[in-house]
Amino acid sequence: GNGIKKSFNKEIEDKFAGTLGSASINVKGKYANTAAIGDATTAIGTLSEAYGTGSTAIGINSLTKGVASTGIGIMTRSWGTNSLALGTQVGAYGDRSSSIGDTNQVGLDMKDGSKSGKESAAVGSKNTIYGNQAYAIGAGNTIGSATVMTTTEANGSGAGADQDKITTVTDGTVKGNMSGAFGYKNSITADNSYVVGSNSNVSADGAMVLGNNASVTAKNAVALGNNTKVDNESAVALGTGSETAAAVATPSATINGAVHNFAGINPASTVSVGKAGMERTITNVAAGRISDTSTDAINGSQLHAVTSEMDKGVAYAGDVKAASATANKFTRKFGEQTNIVGGVTDPTKLSDNNIGVVSNGTDTLNVKLAKTLTGLESVTAGSTTINNDGLTV
């Protein structure tokens, strides 16, 4: 009746508290300025206000604007539909977003009137998420980037109304979608990227970081280890302090005068296990395939097999051995010199085409004298000499 209406209006006038929506609950304390304004809303505490239909604001200066949103704590803000803000000075602005802890912000006002931070969550302290479907667990993490401006908006009614600083995206673009940061003071300004560690930075899409003080500036790159750095697309840095460099193609090499073409001549990127001055060995590598088309890594035992065969050298054998020799054969290793001595050292006193070398097709070369000798100046056999002047006995 009129008595109830007057009493209700008197409560609003005296306490700056109200229950304006249907099926709403307003519970006030000694310093209440609490308002459950939307339909089916609940506001409990001091300076708390529930605007969104089915929303709940509990605590001190908590504000819920989103439909079915919940804000519990001190200075919580739940603006997104089905959003949750739980803690102290936390904001859940995106639809179905969650902000739990202390001084977290999830989402922004977009230029078109929508909100970023959809289905994102921050748990911990001083985390900021601009992107959609992004997650931050820890402290001081930042996911996403945007060109923003800050305005001031009054919230609430009566003398207890407060003012919120509203961060608005001015260019309509937000990075940091579907990304995640777990740790302390990590920064991600890219989509589909993840960081686990502390003080690491990712500024390229599709990147992965596991470590502290790491940096990734190239797409689809991976950094594993502390103080790693990846600046090349699709590259991988493994181990503390590792840094990547641009991949270098090696199509062929000339060995002993012969050109050998290689497989895998168009590398997509590179894997680094150190940096200049801090190189590492790679151990426990399985034997790779050996062929003209193989791109497998080769381990030390395979190289040993090659060098051990080369160390065997080449064996040379004669029909007989010299009186001072122990055998009629000897072995020379790769790079060692073999001397073949005929006796005559003046090339002008040598003939041509009087000796032939015949192979048996397996392992023997036979040196034979021509049946018809040409280009000779003289032939001496014992005391007999044949030359251009005739026969001398």
Predicted feature residues:
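Low-complexity, glycine- and small/polar-enriched segments
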Residues: 5, 9, 13, 361-366, ...
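Extracellular/surface-exposed low-complexity segments
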Residues: 304-312
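Short, solvent-exposed secondary-structure boundary motifs
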Residues: 118, 223, 251-266, 327-351, ...
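Extracellular receptor-binding modules and their adjoining Ser/Thr/Gly/Asp/Asn-rich linkers
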Residues: 311-365
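Low-complexity, small-hydrophobic/phenylalanine-enriched stretches
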Residues: 121, 271, 282, 303, ...
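Short, polar loop/linker segments at the starts of domains and inter-domain junctions
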Residues: 6-15, 111-115, 287-300, 322-339
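Extracellular repetitive beta-rich solenoid segments
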Residues: 267, 275-305, 351, 359-363, ...
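Glycine- and small/polar-enriched repetitive beta-structure motifs of secreted/surface proteins
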Residues: 1-284, 301-304
